[in-house]
């Protein structure tokens, strides 16, 4: 049994290793040279994970949940006369639309059903029709359902039409290989508590240096000013403008070391992929059907359709919690689903124990 009181089968926060937890038992000063040097190391390691063309990119760390970092990008990168095209097929794409509207940014939406990927033909049509669009954003892994969106195609279109490209890779970065230089991504956003397997407390933005320099003075918020945050970290050896989550940063640094020890992003992807395939195979044997078509399914989290009208998710949830597992309810409106994640410190034995527990906790048919 895992040392945790529960194994979190969620898309983040997730189950972390004992060693990641242990580094949070100590206290650190935000002004300490050793701490700030470590912050710089974290920033450099993130760029190295993101691309081989490291000199073109830089990292900004931002306090708060991943959503704070997304809003920092939306509010800092798009100028007053800019216009944003949002590709959405889930809650997190919709949240970006909400942000843009709250910040009085002109926004155009390309929306597909939650179980269907971004419609590339529609995106191109919108780019052809609306010459005022300056920026385009897509969510890579939409954890509303677990679907993977075609960021390669979206980014190609963005560059074909001369747009600044933003990718919300919150639940994919560190777990799925991405080279932001190859894809010509200008701003990629993720969080400490996802595939790198840290804990919640900050997000990060890996940015094209040339595009980031254009953001000076554009921010619509003091605390979420992406350029000012970067400039302070760059000029003052890793210093944050405001109090940083020191324990979380140390845990994240440890998580980065453990990602490297595992064999890097490809090795972690292989583990997640194997977990997800095993999970789906076993769940199908019990009569559960995945919502998303296999060719669009991510290795991060899987949505399962309720097997029958009388199925009680809460009953299954409570039963699994009794066995030491926590899963997620569904998040879409048109189909009754629940979700099971397989990222974090989760392995084949854990998946086998989970499905055995599900078999005990629910009767289908």
From Swiss-Prot:
Assigned EC number: 2.6.1.37
An individual GO BP term: organic phosphonate catabolic process
InterPro entries recorded: Aminotrans_V_dom, NH2EtPonate_pyrv_transaminase, PyrdxlP-dep_Trfase, PyrdxlP-dep_Trfase_major, PyrdxlP-dep_Trfase_small, SP_NH2Trfase/AEP_transaminase
Reactions catalysed, as given in the entry: (2-aminoethyl)phosphonate + pyruvate = phosphonoacetaldehyde + L-alanine
Pfam families reported for this sequence: Aminotran_5
GO MF annotation: an example: 2-aminoethylphosphonate-pyruvate transaminase activity
Superkingdom of the source species: Bacteria
Keywords assigned by UniProt, alphabetized: Aminotransferase, Pyridoxal phosphate, Pyruvate, Transferase
Residues where N6-(pyridoxal phosphate)lysine is found: 194
Ranges in coiled-coil conformation: none
Top EC class for this record: transferase
UniProt xrefs under SUPFAM superfamilies: PLP-dependent transferases (SSF53383)
Cofactor(s) annotated in UniProt: pyridoxal 5'-phosphate
Family, similarity comment: Belongs to the class-V pyridoxal-phosphate-dependent aminotransferase family. PhnW subfamily.
Quaternary organization: Homodimer.
Function summary: Involved in phosphonate degradation.
Protein name as it appears in the record: 2-aminoethylphosphonate--pyruvate transaminase
Annotated source species: Bacillus mycoides (strain KBAB4) (Bacillus weihenstephanensis)
Gene that encodes the chain: phnW
């Amino acid at each position: 049994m895992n040392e945790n009181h529960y194994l979190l089968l969620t898309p983040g926060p997730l189950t972390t290793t004992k060693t990641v937890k242990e580094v949070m038992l100590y206290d650190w000063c935000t002004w300490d040279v050793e701490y700030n040097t470590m912050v710089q190391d974290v920033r450099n390691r993130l760029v190295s994970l993101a691309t081989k063309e490291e000199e073109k990119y830089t990292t900004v760390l931002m306090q708060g949940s991943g959503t704070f970092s997304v809003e920092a990008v939306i509010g800092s990168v798009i100028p007053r006369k800019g216009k944003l095209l949002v590709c959405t097929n889930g809650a997190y794409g919709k949240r970006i639309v909400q942000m843009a509207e709250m910040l009085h940014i002109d926004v155009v939406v390309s929306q597909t059903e939650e179980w269907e990927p971004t419609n590339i033909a529609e995106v191109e049509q919108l780019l052809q029709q609306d010459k005022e669009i300056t920026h385009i954003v897509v969510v890579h892994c939409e954890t509303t359902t677990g679907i993977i969106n075609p960021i390669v195609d979206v980014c190609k279109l963005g560059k074909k039409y001369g747009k600044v490209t933003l990718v919300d890779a919150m639940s994919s970065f560190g777990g799925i290989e991405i080279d932001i230089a190859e894809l010509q991504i200008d701003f990629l956003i993720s969080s400490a508590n996802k595939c790198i397997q840290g804990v919640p407390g900050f997000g990060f933005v890996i940015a094209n240096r040339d595009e980031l320099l254009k953001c000076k003075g554009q921010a619509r918020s003091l605390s979420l000013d992406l350029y000012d945050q970067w400039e302070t970290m760059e000029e003052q050896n890793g210093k944050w403008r405001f109090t940083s989550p020191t324990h979380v940063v140390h845990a994240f640094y440890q998580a980065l070391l453990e990602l490297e020890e595992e064999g890097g992003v490809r090795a972690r992807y292989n583990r997640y992929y194997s977990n997800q395939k095993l999970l789906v195979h076993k769940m199908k044997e019990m009569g559960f059907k995945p919502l998303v078509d296999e060719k669009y399914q991510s290795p991060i989290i899987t949505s399962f359709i309720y097997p029958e009208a009388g199925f009680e998710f809460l009953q299954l949830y409570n039963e699994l919690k009794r066995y030491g597992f926590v899963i997620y309810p569904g998040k879409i409106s048109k189909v009754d689903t629940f979700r099971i994640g397989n990222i974090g410190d989760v392995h084949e034995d854990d998946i086998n124990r989970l499905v055995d527990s599900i078999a005990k906790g629910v009767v289908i048919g």
